[in-house]
């Protein structure tokens, strides 16, 4: 048996009780799990401070001396505060505990010399260390101690007496037990070319570094390895899919595309749109299945690019579908496509949950006999009973509302899978896109169509409602429409937020002359659709809503987005909401309304929003503030985000390096049959077996 797979219970210092806590709280079940539970920071322990040198704001420090005496203070409810008065000959401080008196009196003795490690604070004009680490000075070689590792722990662990220091000791016990070098998981040609230290050295140095250089070299090696295998898994999956499924070959740019380009194109394409259309055309003409992600802010012209891609499919004798996340967005796409294709002899139909009876049969029959060229719908399109004559291209709008499983269902509609174009207005940072949508090629539309004015974003405090309401009234009197967004539907007992229902009533009193709609997440879909339709058709001037309006709808006449309690929203969410306006030729505004109690992080979010409209710049900032697991879409991606040491937000260069190296391997050994790569394929198999998320896309 591999010693690294040994049950953690059998490690000296663990036992059955600690085993259960480590497993439940940290997911540590084996020696390997403990080795791969990495420190989150280090403190230099080569320096010993004098008590006279201590300061109130110092980080963790160590002092050396002896205990003068013990003292106990009754805190009531059978609790005691135990204080040891400690001196190093240059001053006196206190060591403080709030429990564990038996252990303290049994293990620590007056006049014996100890090394104390902890964070100093001041109490009653004297420095104290609360629950410090204490070591016998005679057993420590202070000059050789190096860096002290710190490990994250939970409250339950602390109550059970398992601290960062405990994990440090357990890890030390394990490393001393592992006499033989730990097995290598990267081939020599990679470690030598990239100047990486061995896995054996990295795992030992990450837990017991002597210097900062040790920690950095260990981290680079372990981060690279982790990211490399994530990328190898994704790229192998994509390679397997390409070899397994032969894509349709669209060789023709025919009359439908040319007619549209010559007669119906509403405005000159931006350079970004032209570039993306070329990328899509190259994919669909390669004979391999296209899997492409198209990113672009709201209003950047993604739908037009998708339509021109659909016309290439139609010119080659194939059907196409466009899937949207909601019925109202599907209806809007249908209307947009019909306007674009006016006068062209193409049959376009809608297929959503509301299409029933005779009409539904007409549509399903038209898909089977091939008389329908383009179908627009919701997830109803991927139902098993919906069949196509020859589906050649599937366009999916707002990918994160669907997910990998739904995308895979489309592949089963034909003998060969259709080309796939995924569109999203949620900006995805480059490093994250490589990981979430690693099996997709990425295109970006980073220009707005001509004539669009950048949205002006303004920050107002909630005490400035008079000027806010005056601005709203002025815009509506100019013929525009306004969104007003609330963060919650029901009041929280702990957080005082505006309630949409009471807010709606208050706004009706402020604007009695205007008609208003409201939508929120607890309404039935039909109610939401009806209210939204009133606003889309211009029958209401103000739409009061929660964040359910993030996705989709296109109301060019809406020129103002007011976001109340904007401090409660993440950056990407604020940007998505802002993208609902700015779709017409008129100047649009986004008003971020907050209270005066703003944290430093909230101020940064507001400042970023007010200073840039660049979705990718915002997404990068959001990734650094929140981490990848919190970003919309990552949970449905099928990619693991429980990275143990790498950080996608901060390790962008390593992500790119790992992808480049993984791509070289796939290019050199697409069928995973070359013996020189056996180490990699065997390790990847181990990781897939151990990680449910990886297996889900494999």
Where would I find each of the regions flagged by the language model?
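Long, highly charged, low-complexity intrinsically disordered interaction regions
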Residues: 1-12, 20, 24, 230, ...
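OB-fold nucleic-acid-binding modules
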Residues: 37-68
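Upstream accessory/linker segments immediately N-terminal to the RecA-like ATPase cores of bacterial MutS
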Residues: 73-264, 668
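N-terminal cationic and glycine-rich segments that engage phosphates or anionic surfaces
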Residues: 128-131, 137, 393, 409-410, ...
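N-terminal pre-Walker A segment at the start of P-loop NTPase domains
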Residues: 263, 267-277
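Inter-lobe coupling/hinge segments of SF2-like helicase ATPases
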Residues: 275-278, 286-607, 671
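Accessory helical-bundle/CTD segments and flexible terminal tails appended to RecA-like ATPase motors
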Residues: 513, 532-542, 549-556, 561-564, ...
């Amino acid at each position: 048996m591999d010693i690294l797979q040994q049950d953690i219970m059998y490690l000296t210092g663990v036992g059955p009780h600690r085993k259960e806590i480590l497993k439940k709280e940290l997911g540590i079940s084996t020696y390997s799990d403990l080795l791969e539970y990495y420190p989150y920071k280090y403190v230099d322990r080569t320096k010993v401070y004098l008590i006279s040198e201590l300061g109130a704001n110092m980080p963790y420090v160590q002092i050396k001396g002896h205990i003068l005496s013990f003292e106990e203070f009754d805190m009531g409810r059978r609790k005691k505060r135990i204080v040891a008065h400690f001196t190093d000959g240059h001053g006196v401080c206190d060591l403080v505990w709030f429990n564990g008196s038996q252990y303290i009196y049994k293990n620590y003795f007056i006049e014996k010399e100890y090394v104390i490690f902890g964070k100093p604070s001041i109490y009653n004009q004297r420095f104290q260390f609360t629950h410090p680490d204490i070591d016998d000075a005679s057993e420590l070689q202070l000059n050789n101690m190096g860096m002290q590792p710190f490990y994250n722990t939970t409250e339950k662990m602390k109550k059970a007496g398992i601290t960062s220091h405990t994990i440090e000791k357990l890890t030390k016990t394990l490393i001393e037990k592992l006499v033989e070098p730990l097995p290598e998981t990267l081939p020599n040609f990679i470690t030598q070319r990239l100047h990486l230290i061995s896995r054996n050295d990295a795992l030992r140095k990450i837990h017991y570094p002597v210097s900062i250089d040790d920690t950095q070299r260990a981290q680079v090696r372990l981060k690279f390895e982790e990211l490399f295998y994530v990328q190898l898994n994704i790229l192998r999956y994509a390679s397997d899919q390409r070899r397994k499924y032969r894509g349709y070959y669209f060789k023709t740019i025919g009359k439908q595309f040319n007619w549209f380009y010559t007669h119906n194109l509403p405005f000159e394409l931006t350079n970004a749109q032209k570039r993306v259309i070329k990328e899509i055309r190259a994919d669909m003409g390669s004979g391999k299945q296209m899997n492409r992600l198209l990113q672009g802010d709201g209003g950047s012209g993604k739908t037009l690019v998708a339509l021109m891609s659909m016309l290439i499919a139609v010119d080659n004798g194939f059907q196409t579908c466009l899937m949207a996340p909601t019925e109202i967005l599907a209806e809007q796409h249908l209307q947009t496509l019909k306007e674009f294709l006016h006068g062209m002899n193409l049959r376009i139909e809608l297929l959503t949950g509301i299409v029933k009876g005779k009409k539904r049969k007409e549509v399903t029959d038209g898909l089977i006999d091939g008389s329908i060229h383009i179908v627009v719908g919701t997830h109803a399109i991927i139902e098993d009973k919906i069949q196509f004559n020859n589906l050649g291209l599937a366009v999916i709008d707002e990918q994160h509302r669907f997910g990998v499983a739904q995308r895979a269902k489309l592949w089963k509609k034909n003998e060969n899978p259709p080309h796939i174009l995924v569109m999203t207005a949620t900006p995805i940072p480059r490093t994250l896109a490589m990981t979430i949508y690693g099996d997709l090629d990425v295109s970006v539309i980073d220009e707005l169509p001509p004539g669009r004015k950048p949205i002006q974003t303004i920050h107002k405090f909630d005490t400035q409602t008079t000027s806010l309401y005056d601005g709203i009234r002025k815009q509506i009197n100019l013929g525009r429409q306004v969104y007003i967004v609330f963060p919650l539907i029901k009041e929280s007992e702990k957080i005082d937020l505006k309630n949409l229902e009471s807010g709606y009533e208050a706004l009706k009193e402020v604007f009695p002359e205007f008609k208003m709609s409201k939508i929120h997440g607890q309404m039935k879909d039909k109610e939401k659709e009806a209210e939204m339709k009133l606003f889309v058709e211009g029958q209401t001037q103000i739409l009061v809503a929660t964040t359910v309006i993030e996705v989709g709808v296109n109301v060019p006449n809406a020129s103002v987005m007011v976001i109340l309690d904007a401090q409660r929203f993440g950056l990407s969410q604020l940007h998505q909401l802002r993208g609902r306006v700015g779709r017409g030729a008129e100047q649009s505004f986004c008003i971020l309304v907050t209270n005066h109690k703003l944290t430093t992080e909230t101020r940064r979010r507001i400042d970023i929003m007010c200073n840039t409209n660049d979705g990718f710049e915002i997404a990068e900032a959001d990734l650094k503030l929140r981490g990848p697991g919190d970003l919309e879409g990552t949970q449905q991606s099928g990619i693991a985000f429980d990275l143990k040491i790498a950080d996608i937000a901060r390790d962008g260069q390593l992500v790119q390096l790992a992808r480049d190296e993984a791509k070289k391997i796939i290019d050199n050994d697409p069928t995973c049959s070359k013996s020189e790569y056996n180490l990699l394929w065997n390790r990847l198999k181990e990781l897939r077996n151990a990680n449910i998320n990886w297996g889900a896309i494999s």
